[in-house]
Amino acid sequence: MEARVLLLCAVLFLLVHTPPAAGGLNNKCAYFRGQCRRKCPQRDIFFGFCRNHDQCCLSSLHTRH
């Protein structure tokens, strides 16, 4: 019985502390115009930081000249 309680606590702990998947809405930024990346490509413009501390990169196509 005690082993089951410990196993349940361990599973719940892992579920609570597991980060969400990196796909979907989490990799968008700048009002869904930007892309979260570790480092912006040279052709893109750095806009700020994403929730996961990656750089928010705007394609030069989305910016006004």
From Swiss-Prot:
Keywords, comma-separated and alphabetical: Antibiotic, Antimicrobial, Defensin, Disulfide bond, Secreted, Signal
Superkingdom of the organism of origin: Eukaryota
Cited InterPro entries: Beta-defensin, Beta_defensin_dom
Position of the signal peptide: 1-23
Main subcellular location of this protein, as a coarse class: secreted
Subcellular location: Secreted
Main function: Has antimicrobial activity.
Family note: Belongs to the beta-defensin family.
Name of protein: Defensin-B2
Taxonomic classification: Eukaryota, Metazoa, Chordata, Craniata, Vertebrata
